[in-house]
Amino acid sequence: MQIIIPTNIIKTLIMASIFALSFNIQAELQVDNKAPNFSLQDQELNYHSLSDYLGRWVVLYFYPKDDTPGCTTQACGIRDAQKQIISTKAVIFGISLDSVESHKRFSEKYQLPFSILSDPDGKVADSYDSLRSLFSFKLAKRNTFIVDPNGRIAKTYIGVNPAKHTQMILDDLIYLQKE
């Protein structure tokens, strides 16, 4: 006796398997994991390494592209909350795959008072599970990480809403620093 399985069921099973396997391709950074170190250049040609900031709270926000609507909303929200962020004694870095020159134009246009780091090959974004690739085209995903003074991930935000994100960062920095 031969069992015949309908084609649509086979296709569904194959797609479900591919979908399930896609979650195991790269392990996500979790709270309490050691934050991957990096050394990247900012819009003023200064290099920043995460290890230079041990002992401080660090906010790393990855974003897709300079001077685009969502990214501008996010950057300007952080700019407008700069005094509150400084009051938490945290340092904040924006990171995208754009060039140093692009970051300089973006920073000057919107008077951004924080460093924006250039990750042109996407290696740092990839180490933070924040790289989106489509063939040879790459962009950073809109993800954010709060790193504690010991260099460990204290909070992750995946696929953030640019308009509401700054307040979430501030609230969580205050909460995490009380623990």
Where do the protein language model's features map onto the residues?
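Short loop/turn microsegments at loop-to-beta-strand junctions
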Residues: 35-36, 57, 141-143
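Short, acidic, Ser/Thr-enriched surface-loop or helix-capping motifs
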Residues: 29, 42-43, 147-148
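Thiol-/selenol-based redox modules, centered on thioredoxin-like
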Residues: 139-179
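A short beta-strand-turn-helix
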Residues: 38-57
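Short active-site neighborhood of thiol/selenol oxidoreductases, capturing the structured segment around
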Residues: 51-72
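N-terminal secretory signal peptides that target proteins for export/translocation
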Residues: 1-7
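Structural microenvironment flanking redox-active thiols in thiol-disulfide oxidoreductases
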Residues: 72-112, 123-125
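N-proximal helix/coil linker or "cap" segments that precede and/or mark the start of modular domains
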Residues: 6, 14-37
